[in-house]
Regions:
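Right-handed parallel beta-helix/beta-solenoid
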Residues: 1-12, 31, 72
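Extracellular beta-strand-rich solenoid/capping regions of secreted or surface-exposed proteins
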Residues: 11, 18, 34-50, 58-104, ...
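Loop/turn elements at helix/coil->beta-strand transitions in domains of secreted/extracellular proteins
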Residues: 20-24
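Well-ordered beta-strand segments characteristic of repetitive beta-sheet solenoids
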Residues: 25, 50-53, 166
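Short, structured coil/turn linkers that connect adjacent secondary-structure elements
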Residues: 111, 115-116, 148, 152, ...
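Hydrophobic strand positions within the blades of repeat-based beta-sheet folds
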Residues: 127, 143, 163-165
Length: 166
């Protein structure tokens, strides 16, 4: 927790060039909005060993014992406009274009993608996986996906695209 970052730092970590293939990202309870504006949200093109939610805000130092995913809800959200629904002005959550990623104990909520923001291979509002089938997958453990919506003609609201292991 000594290296905690804000939401903008988290988004940059996921989409940037830092190697996370051997790293675990620990997330405390709270809402992490994936963009400051509408659109696709965070685009990931790399391996991430693990993203684990459900930790208390009171966690300190290197203590990882204060974790209860049902009590300390960690939400990856697209609710840019803050009205607790997926609608115009909000963003998609994760667009995975490459990498093998493990995510545990996270709720994905209020992802939204308009028809104007969507492309033929970038049209999911929740978690959209679009990469090489041999090197791109997302494994979700103890996660919830809800209230995601897309108006894209070919889009999907929840998990869509490539390989997802639930």
């Amino acid at each position: 927790w000594d290296q905690a970052m804000d939401v903008a730092g988290f988004r940059k970590l996921l989409s940037g060039s830092i190697d996370l293939s051997k790293s675990t990202i620990y997330m405390s309870q709270g809402k992490y909005v994936m963009s400051e504006t509408g659109g696709l949200g965070v685009i990931i093109r790399k391996d991430i060993k693990a993203i684990k939610g459900g930790y208390s805000l009171l966690s300190e130092g290197t203590d990882l014992t204060n974790r209860r995913i049902d009590t300390y809800k960690t939400v990856i959200s697209g609710d840019v406009n803050g009205n607790n629904q997926a609608d115009s002005g909000d963003c998609g959550l994760l667009l995975v274009k490459g990498g093998i990623i493990g995510i545990e104990g996270v709720t994905f909520q209020y992802g939204y993608l308009s028809n104007n923001d969507a492309k033929s291979n970038e049209c999911g509002s929740g978690i959209y996986i679009n990469g090489n089938v041999n090197s791109t997958s997302v494994e979700l453990t103890d996660c919830i996906i809800r209230d995601c919506k897309t108006e894209a003609v070919n889009g999907q609201g929840g998990v869509a695209g490539g390989t997802a292991i639930l």
